[in-house]
Amino acid sequence: MVISSCDDNQIFDQYQSLPKYWNKDSVKTFSFVAPDTINSYNLYVNLRNNNDYKYSNLMLIVEMDYPNGKAVKDTLEYRMANPQGEFLGTGFTDVKENKLWYKGYEEPFVFSESGKYTVGVQQAMRENGQVSGITNLEGITDVGFRIERTK
């Protein structure tokens, strides 16, 4: 299921729902055409989590495939809860919305090529002291990708 939303700054905003868990081999992909190669944009990974999420952080592997075939892969860590264990996302129910910076926060992000890009998002969580990773991560209900105009 794909869910989209709309506002003035939005260029692209799409979610994909997950089953009861997020398998470590499941890559959620989002394809879009670059709006232009002149202006700068903010790029986000959006997540929804519920109380089944048992961790204070989240590790993701995010890969951007460019139109010319170049691929840039980043391993990213996000804080999901404060030291008291309260989730940092927004929302009044047990489902929290998280808007996590991907590109544009340290320096302006400009699409360097015209054409179709694909972004893949994969969970890379591990238990302390474990190498193999968490096979089925519970508590993440939706994964999304968003592009906004800079203000």
Name the predicted role of every residue range.
Residues 78-80, 88-109:
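A beta-strand/beta-hairpin structural motif
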Residues 15-16, 74-82:
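Solvent-exposed serine/threonine-rich low-complexity stretches and specific carbohydrate-binding patches
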Residues 30-39, 108-112, 146-151:
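Extracellular and analogous surface-interaction loops
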Residues 9-63, 69:
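Start-of-domain marker
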